[in-house]
């Protein structure tokens, strides 16, 4: 039996994309698998009794070393903010190419804590900063210094000791441009360096909390239990800065979604599902429900989604009790039942679960998730208006039905903030600045393009058309990209009144491998990464299902 790939017109709706969850394809999981044979070292740990100072951690293999350089700083409580306008943080980090010299560390110490205001060099690859979860951090310090382990239930509600508020790469603020490193085999997968930075930052948080507790009361101090450490991740506060990425990188977005869709298709095509594979699926599913129950949020929107997800998963477990996995194509049968009987959130959740047993399917696809975007930048000027019209009618049918003469269809606009050069979303009718609008209203511009070519001759060459219509060059390019890359385009209006920007954030974060989505509004949220992951000195031997570990 051959299963068709799912229709992009269905999958690329934001309501569905915003229901994606971490999976075996997620970058932090594939990063750990790829780097399990690298040698981990803590090269420098020079903190004072209060935990302020410098530290260096590294991964090395053969002649290659990547080093995380950490700077822990003293700040007051009123200076601690997750907002992008913040200028001070509890700690600042940079991933350095090679082992930093004393001179490098001194140079970095002057610049890294300044973040965007500082200046870095081609030797630096990624940049980040993070703030303590003060309640969790102080609870752990107090517990360890008094000879007891911290409260697991309390920590499970937070999930981390620090949360990052930004991770920068690829040429930002002087960091190395991508062309310098893109041919390195070990980092050819998406966001490998960013994942490495966050993972090593996590280890720094454990070392720092142990160090402070030890100095506070050396007689009674005990070290943080390894099991508790494993089940703490790194938090992240993420806002609109992440959203335009998936619009601005259509071929990359396609490759992420296509890998997932290919994986699902191949799993559904497995004729004889082995008992051990079905058991892995069920075990991961049951463990994951335990994790969902520890997913805390103050957002009523997210509480309702979690409540519905748990209800749907319990329905599924009842169905599975009488399900015969020995039937031919049993995962396909299961998937079709889920699509018909459960909500979107649960459907996409189960897609992630169904991938778990199949390394042989997933591992090759991991290497298809990058993109050489410049190869597809040129517009085929010798193609015709007829070609373009056919593409628009086939690939953008739902978008062409949107009525942009209605006020609500144009309600929002995207712009770049002056002070932090970060993307923002504003109401076109209540706020100023629409003259600075960024070209992120793809649906509106596709519709405009379709109307513009309606009175053109079918035989007109695209190159000739663009001479008079240069303002639409960006969507002409996208249309021809969509011809080759079916999952490259969001099939929704990104400036309409019903836009939920958080769906765009969740999509990207699910591919990172984030869990515990905690929306603080429809424009920013907190998440957790690497919760349950092995510690760096345990990488050589660990279960690939670590993500389903739980503090509870």
Predicted regions: what they are:
Residues 29-32, 138-141, 145, 159-162, ...:
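Residue-level detector of alpha-helical secondary structure
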Residues 63-127, 198-214, 218-246, 255-258, ...:
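Intrinsically disordered, low-complexity regulatory segments enriched in Ser/Thr/Pro
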Residues 32-89, 386-387, 391, 400-402, ...:
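Amphipathic, interaction-prone secondary-structure segments
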Residues 498-552:
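Long, highly charged alpha-helical interaction/scaffolding segments
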Residues 16-42:
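Amphipathic alpha-helical segments
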Residues 2-19, 50-52, 65, 220, ...:
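Long, solvent-exposed non-transmembrane regions
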Residues 111-180:
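Charged, structured surface patches that assemble and position nucleic-acid processing machinery
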